[in-house]
């Protein structure tokens, strides 16, 4: 099993090209099921979860091809299977996003209950309840969600009990082919939801309000394929910016979108970073200074993203002062903390809050990645730790970061993959 070995590298410097957003690419690939003609998606990152999504589509009978330039073409002409099996779904929670498209276009879907990162309960009941309001008959049996509808789904007024990105996306795709208007209230406002809505509209859907808490979808009878470019990955961008801040460096993220990172950029400025932005780039300069501690509370977008929480744990571990980080989105999302403590971080957990007293130095150690973003935080910690850090179980990292070791090397980081 692959590992990463990391050594303290000094201040990161240079340009890093940001990949397409995993969390936008996955639902957009699933939306390919809705298209009656060939669907082409570009700027798709080369990641384990993307490969799993392509394998799932092939398992259903779709033809999926990939070019070297990150372009994926999907044809559903021969799609004739409607079951997403446990073997694929168990490795990636986003597989649940096939449910809405299959049901909307074909009237039937069997989807195994999902797996993915072990970061607490992420219930699927919001997905199921919304589809039931649109006329689906659903039962959960033998570990599978079995959904059926006679004819087309019907437009409905859906109020989400809690904000859920995945449920918003699933219902958005299902409603695109429903009969009549669907209104989703208390919808997720994340940029990835907007990207999916823009893609569906390019396919012929009639969606308005994405990015607000109320989305309106006027169902259409069919959708066509199109060519669509996935948005930049805001979490990858934020991860590199934090790495630069922790190493007291100066980097520029290109092919990025500053508008999607306002909460993160504000916290980096609070930490002492000088931030400059253009339309598609972000530059961070720490001017050789140690970061200042910053308090964080994760919130749904446009608040501070839960997917950046672990990285800011590392920043605060090395910052001047004391800070708290409160996690409000997921339970069990501080599994990186014991690993950082093994590296010398001064942290303690109280419920869903981590109290961090900054120290000047971390020590290299053998650590274990427990989920996707936790693994990124351990790599960042290794870049400033005294000695060698080895990160095990980096298959988590490969689910969400494209060529991470090569990108860090390009900035001067000593990060090596060992088989």
UniProtKB/Swiss-Prot annotation:
Gene3D superfamilies: Enolpyruvate transferase domain (3.65.10.10). It catalyses: phosphoenolpyruvate + UDP-N-acetyl-alpha-D-glucosamine = UDP-N-acetyl-3-O-(1-carboxyvinyl)-alpha-D-glucosamine + phosphate. Pathway: Cell wall biogenesis; peptidoglycan biosynthesis. Its EC number is 2.5.1.7. GO terms for cellular component: cytoplasm. One of its GO terms (molecular function) is UDP-N-acetylglucosamine 1-carboxyvinyltransferase activity. Phosphoenolpyruvate binds at residues 22-23. It is found in: Cytoplasm. The active site is at residue 117. It holds the Pfam family EPSP_synthase. GO terms for biological process: cell division; cell wall organization; peptidoglycan biosynthetic process; regulation of cell shape; UDP-N-acetylgalactosamine biosynthetic process. Keywords: Cell cycle, Cell division, Cell shape, Cell wall biogenesis/degradation, Cytoplasm, Peptidoglycan synthesis, Pyruvate, Transferase. UDP-N-acetyl-alpha-D-glucosamine binds at residues 93, 307, 329. The modification 2-(S-cysteinyl)pyruvic acid O-phosphothioketal is found at residue 117. Belongs to the EPSP synthase family. MurA subfamily. Cell wall formation. Adds enolpyruvyl to UDP-N-acetylglucosamine. This is UDP-N-acetylglucosamine 1-carboxyvinyltransferase. It comes from Shewanella loihica (strain ATCC BAA-1088 / PV-4).
């Amino acid at each position: 099993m692959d590992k990463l070995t990391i050594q303290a590298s000094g201040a990161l410097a240079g340009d890093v090209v940001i990949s397409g957003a995993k969390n936008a690419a996955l639902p957009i690939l699933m939306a390919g099921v809705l298209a009656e003609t060939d669907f082409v998606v570009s700027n798709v990152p080369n990641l384990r979860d993307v490969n799993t999504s392509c394998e799932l589509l092939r398992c259903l009978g779709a033809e999926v091809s990939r070019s070297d330039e990150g372009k994926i073409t999907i044809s559903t002409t021969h799609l004739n299977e409607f079951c997403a099996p446990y073997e694929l779904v168990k490795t990636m929670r986003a597989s649940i996003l096939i449910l809405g498209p299959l049901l909307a276009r074909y009237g039937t879907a069997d989807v195994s209950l999902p797996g993915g990162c072990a970061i607490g309960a992420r219930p699927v009941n919001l997905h199921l309840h919304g589809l039931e309001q649109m006329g689906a008959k659903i039962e959960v049996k033998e570990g599978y969600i079995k959904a059926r509808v006679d004819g087309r789904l019907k437009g409905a007024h859906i109020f989400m009990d809690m904000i859920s990105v995945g449920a918003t996306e699933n219902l958005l795709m299902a409603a695109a082919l429903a009969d009549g208007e669907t209104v989703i209230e208390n919808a997720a406002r994340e940029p990835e939801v907007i990207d999916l809505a823009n893609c569906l509209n390019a396919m012929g859907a009639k969606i308005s309000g994405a990015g607000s808490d109320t989305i309106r979808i006027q169902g259409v009878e069919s959708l066509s394929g199109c060519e669509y470019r996935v948005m930049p990955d805001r979490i990858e961008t934020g991860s590199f910016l934090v790495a630069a801040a922790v190493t007291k460096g100066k980097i520029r993220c290109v092919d990025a979108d500053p508008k999607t990172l306002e909460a993160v950029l504000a916290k980096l400025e609070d930490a002492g970073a000088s931030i400059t932005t253009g339309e598609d780039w972000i530059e961070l300069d720490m001017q050789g200074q140690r970061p200042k501690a910053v308090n964080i509370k994760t919130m749904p977008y446009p608040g501070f993203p839960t997917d950046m929480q672990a990285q800011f744990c590392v920043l605060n571990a090395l910052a001047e002062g004391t800070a708290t980080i409160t996690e409000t989105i997921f339970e069990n999302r501080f599994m990186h903390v014991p690993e950082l403590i093994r590296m010398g971080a001064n942290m303690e957990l109280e419920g869903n809050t981590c109290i961090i007293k900054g120290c000047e130095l971390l020590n290299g150690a053998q650590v274990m990645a427990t989920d996707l973003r936790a693994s990124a935080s351990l790599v960042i910690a290794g870049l400033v730790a005294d000695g060698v850090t080895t990160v095990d179980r980096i298959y988590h990292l490969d689910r969400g970061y494209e060529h991470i070791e090569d990108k860090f090397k390009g900035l001067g980081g000593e990060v090596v993959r060992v088989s």
